[in-house]
């Protein structure tokens, strides 16, 4: 009879080896994903490193800086000249920017959830963050317009017909009058009535 009892003793051995193996690989990342809602952003962190704020050049004028400081002080609920990381996105939007949450996290240095709720930033540190977001918006606008105009670039040579561009400017989006269109297109058409739309866009966005 004792030999027959040896067989069941081996049964736990099989699953005891396979179970830890199955848990060990996904265990750590899965636990983090459940514990921290920000974990799904981890891949983005590796692809988009934090912005180097020391290289950001402040381009705001004096009036803008005064307006920004006043708004910053309204968000300072403690009165120590600082606001929480978690308030930065809302303040940026209140100041006319429209950054995504990912963009806000990027300029903040990709902080963890706990840091968003505990770390604070003063106005001088916040300013280059706001500037970085503003420049990123301008670049995004350029890329969006460029992509839209490529639809009319039938030859793929970086040019569109002036007539088509006139039609777009007077009928789509924030419609322009014919006089306004002629003003912005002045000097951009070549002898064939075509316009280099990349140069045209850079000119328009610099106005």
Curated annotation (Swiss-Prot):
Bias type Low complexity, positions: 36-50
Domain EF-hand: start-end pairs: 63-98, 140-175, 175-207
Organism: Mus musculus
Name under which the protein is recorded: Myosin light chain 6B
Function: Regulatory light chain of myosin. Does not bind calcium.
Segments of this protein annotated with the region Disordered: 1-50
Cellular-component GO terms for this entry: myosin complex; unconventional myosin complex
Subunit architecture: Myosin is a hexamer of 2 heavy chains and 4 light chains.
GO biological process, one term: skeletal muscle tissue development
């Amino acid at each position: 009879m004792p030999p027959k009892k040896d067989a069941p003793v081996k049964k736990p051995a099989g699953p005891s080896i396979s179970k830890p193996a199955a848990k060990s690989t996904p265990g750590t990342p899965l636990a983090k994903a459940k514990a921290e809602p920000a974990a799904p952003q981890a891949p983005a962190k590796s692809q988009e490193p934090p912005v180097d704020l020391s290289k950001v050049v402040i381009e705001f004028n004096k009036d803008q800086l005064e307006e920004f400081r006043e708004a910053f002080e309204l968000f300072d609920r403690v009165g120590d000249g600082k606001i929480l990381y978690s308030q930065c996105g809302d303040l940026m939007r209140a100041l006319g920017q429209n950054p995504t949450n990912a963009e806000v996290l990027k300029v903040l240095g990709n902080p963890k959830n706990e840091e968003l709720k505990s770390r604070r930033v003063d106005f001088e540190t916040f300013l280059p963050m706001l500037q970085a977001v503003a420049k990123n918006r301008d670049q995004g606008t350029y890329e969006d317009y460029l992509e839209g105009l490529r639809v009319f670039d039938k030859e793929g040579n970086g040019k569109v017909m002036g007539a088509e561009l006139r039609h777009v400017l007077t009928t789509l989006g924030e419609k322009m009058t014919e006089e306004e269109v002629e003003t912005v297109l002045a000097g951009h058409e070549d002898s064939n009535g075509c316009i280099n739309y990349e140069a045209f866009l850079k000119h328009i966005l610099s106005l």
